[in-house]
Design a protein with these regions (language model features):
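Generic hydrophobic, aliphatic-rich segments that mediate packing or membrane embedding
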Residues: 58-59, 71, 87, 129
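Membrane-helix interface segments
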Residues: 50, 71-72, 152-155
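Membrane-helix interfacial "entry" motifs
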Residues: 25-28, 70-74, 103, 107-111, ...
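Juxtamembrane/interface alpha-helical elements of multi-pass membrane proteins
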Residues: 76-183
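Interfacial helix-loop-helix linkers and transmembrane-helix boundary segments
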Residues: 53, 71-79
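Transmembrane alpha-helix interface motif
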Residues: 1-68, 171-265
Length: 265
């Protein structure tokens, strides 16, 4: 059971670290959020067969990672968590798209494999961009930035609530795991029936604690919105210049006459 505790503790620590972020965002939160949205929009609009052009967009997370105080290798490893889902989505492309895309010596690469790789690259780059955004401004900053660019308060409040209650769920899970270890179950696997009891008790404990938190919020004047999400940095000239410059670079990646990184696409 020691291994399970370690996983829960690591997940809880990572989730709590997401609240405020590193605080090393090079520009204001709304501007960085818009930059990320522009990046995702232009990157995802690249044709599936244009894999060489798509690879140029990998420069953004590689350059952005050290700017916000992160190591790109760590961000890349974290983004690999989506690979099983992406592979499940695109693995059948080579079976349906059998047209020849290019040849490497005597090896023929079909169009299906190119589009499959394109799906993988898009997913990894999208997750890496979002990870860098959250790591730099934090989840609270992200919700505040969404609020400032016009996203309805109801949605930003719901996002913040989901994040808060995820920490509640993990904290209750950690407490139950420690209580089980204290009663002599260290290192022993749980049976299926015990897992059912564990999940049921975890649900009941989480709901009960959530109700206590909600009553405490109401006692402090909560009216459905979080005032802290409406606050944020003042937009300045640096944000405007950076947004325009980075957008031009992304537009160059998308439509410019760039040389191919590889001999295909």
């Amino acid at each position: 059971m020691k291994r399970e505790v370690s996983k829960v503790e690591k997940a809880l620590t990572a989730l709590l670290a997401m609240h405020s972020g590193s605080g090393k965002a090079p520009i204001g939160t709304p501007a960085l959020l818009i930059v990320t949205l522009v990046y995702l929009g232009l990157m995802l609009s690249v044709a599936p067969e244009a894999l060489a052009r798509l690879l140029w967009f990998a420069l953004y997370p590689i350059v952005m990672a050290p700017v916000v105080g992160e190591q790109y290798g760590r961000v890349f490893v974290r983004s690999l968590a989506v690979l099983p889902f992406v592979i499940l989505i695109g693995i059948f492309n080579p079976l349906y798209q059998t047209e020849v895309a290019f040849r490497i010596g005597s090896v023929t690469i079909s169009r299906g494999w190119v589009t499959f790789m394109s799906i993988l690259v898009r997913a990894l780059l999208s997750v890496q961009a979002l990870l860098l955004l959250v790591d730099s401004v934090g989840f609270a900053g992200l919700c505040s930035g969404l609020r400032r660019i016009g996203v309805p308060a109801l949605l930003t409040t719901q996002l913040m609530m989901v994040y808060r209650y995820m920490t509640v769920l993990l904290q209750e899970s950690l407490d139950m795991t420690r209580a089980r270890q204290a009663r002599g179950y260290r290192g022993r696997n749980m049976s299926l029936s015990m897992w059912g009891t564990y999940c049921g008790q975890l649900f009941l404990r989480t709901v009960a604690r959530s109700e206590r938190i909600h009553r405490a919020m109401l006692a402090r004047g909560f009216n459905g919105s979080m005032p802290v999400l409406a606050a944020g940095e003042v937009w300045n000239r640096r944000d405007t210049v950076t947004l325009v410059a980075v957008t031009c670079v992304f537009a160059l990646f998308r439509w410019g006459p760039l040389p191919a990184l590889f001999a295909f696409g």
